[in-house]
A protein has these predicted regions:
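A short, structured loop/turn motif at beta-sheet edges
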Residues: 19-26, 82-85, 123-133
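N-terminal signal peptide c-region/cleavage motif recognized by signal peptidases
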Residues: 2-4
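N-terminal onset of structured domains
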Residues: 7-50, 61
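Short structured motifs
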Residues: 12-18, 38, 74-76, 116-121
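A beta-strand/beta-hairpin structural motif
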Residues: 28-32, 83, 89, 93-95, ...
Length: 171
């Protein structure tokens, strides 16, 4: 269960994170939900690409100081509608993979899960310490075309990010 989080009408949401030990490595699988606003859908239909970053941090919990960040990485997705092909294209900017879909829900479905994402080796963790995995889906408003950016910062229909969600790492 997450330690924090909430959902907005238009936003991404971290639904579930599962961290397991496979061999000597901890791996993460996660599920997300994307709720696009009408304005975001309209912009995409007009050829505007939308970008999300799935941010993952592994934190060592400390009582006295701020938590120590051991891992800080992101997976970046770009989704764009191609009117001539009547298709949605999702590109994983992190590895260059490109996928085409006939529906928006199918395209968002690809971005809605991560499987077997390597986090850290078991021998890099101190057994008596506590660790948290922090996950967030961030919509990149700075990647929007310049005329849309000011609107995206004041219009709630462009607040398409999730909050940070914390999950304990069970050793």
């Amino acid at each position: 269960m997450p330690l924090s989080g909430n959902a907005d009408e238009f936003a991404a949401q971290v639904k579930q994170v599962q961290i397991t030990l496979q061999g000597e490595s901890y791996i993460m699988s996660a599920e997300f939900v994307y709720q696009l606003s009408e304005k975001a859908k309209e912009a995409m239909k007009n050829g505007v690409p939308l970008f999300w970053d799935i941010q993952v941090k592994l934190l060592q919990h400390r009582e006295v100081f701020w938590d120590k960040t051991l891992i800080d990485t992101a997976i970046r997705y770009r989704i764009q509608y191609h009117a001539l092909l009547n298709m949605y294209r999702v590109r994983n900017e992190s590895d260059g993979e490109v996928y085409n879909f006939s529906t928006l829900s199918s395209a968002l479905g690809l971005m809605s899960s991560i499987h077997d994402f390597p986090l850290i080796e078991k021998n890099e963790l101190v057994p008596e310490k506590n660790y948290l995995c922090a996950v967030k889906v961030s919509f990149d408003r700075e990647a929007l075309p310049l005329p849309l950016r000011p609107i995206a910062y004041i219009d709630p229909q462009w607040y398409l990010s999730s909050d940070w969600t914390l999950w304990p790492l069970k050793k």
